[in-house]
Amino acid sequence: MAFAGLKKQINKANQYMTEKMGGAEGTKLDMDFMEMERKTDVTVELVEELQLKTKEFLQPNPTARAKMAAVKGISKLSGQAKSNTYPQPEGLLAECMLTYGKKLGEDNSVFAQALVEFGEALKQMADVKYSLDDNIKQNFLEPLHHMQTKDLKEVMHHRKKLQGRRLDFDCKRRRQAKDDEIRGAEDKFGESLQLAQVGMFNLLENDTEHVSQLVTFAEALYDFHSQCADVLRGLQETLQEKRSEAESRPRNEFVPKTLLDLNLDGGGGGLNEDGTPSHISSSASPLPSPMRSPAKSMAVTPQRQQQPCCQALYDFDPENPGELGFKENDIITLLNRVDDNWYEGSVNGRTGYFPQSYVQVQVPLP
């Protein structure tokens, strides 16, 4: 039997080479069969490519996919089942926003509160994405894998067997073998032809099941985007409220502290009873102490006043009507805050507007 099988394989190989190299004509199948073969070949490529691209669609980061595959392989070798979920980008961004929102402090910062709200929304979207992954894998990828490993594999097996029996039949006819051998080869050829045709027909005419799987895919995507839209709609409303809250909050005035305010010890920040720095003798130098310079002296005096005022840090030359010009170290009485960048004030009997960046507030407006 072994020798007979080997001889048959040699005869089929001989027939194949004769057809390819010698120009011998083999049995031709009809156009309908060849069209089914073409569509089946396309289906084989489709199922393989569709699985690959769907996985890339659900998990687009190739580095993360490679890491997950490596962990899975190591787990199999070690005999330990170790789960490793794909890091959704929404989840990574959520973690970043939540972490730094909490570090900033939610009690005093509307921005920190908004970050936390945004992070929580992204976290919900990541959970919805995981549900989408599970749905697609179960209802779309698994049926494709089943088709690839069962239906397509069976059809391709019948086609391969048909090709071998066709070569055996043509070889026996070309060599003018005995009638019973030719008849036996023809019967087997006909049997394989029928199995291959039926298998390809059933595969190609199963549109209802294939389209149903696409419907499931589309429904899963629709549900995913609908849930994400609901989450984002709620987030947008919350952030609008946070923005209104931030706009309605009174702006805090900030007066930078000087070394005198800090009352530093040891490094020269302390003062003697006469107001001179403790580490400098009154006769140590004829030059005035920086802490007693006119600019600093003027900076201290207005703080004792009740009237809102500021000290000019630089010269300001007005360029437009209504602006108030002044010189460095001038003390300007604050009358009104125009906006975040401009004040209204008076100095030397003149009144006008001036930029906030040119002054240091000594006594803030009430």
Curated annotation (Swiss-Prot):
A GO CC term assigned to this protein in UniProt: cytosol
Disordered as annotated region, ranges: 266-295
Species, as recorded: Drosophila willistoni (Fruit fly)
Skewed-composition ranges (Low complexity): 277-294
Segments forming domain BAR: 18-248
Membrane topology label: Peripheral membrane protein
Pfam families: BAR, SH3_1
Recorded name of the encoding gene: EndoA
Subcellular location: Cytoplasm; Membrane
UniProt KW Membrane keyword: yes
Keywords, in A-Z order: Coiled coil, Cytoplasm, Endocytosis, Membrane, Phosphoprotein, SH3 domain
Family: Belongs to the endophilin family.
Coiled coil: 227-247
Keyword Lipid metabolism annotated: no
Protein name, per record: Endophilin-A
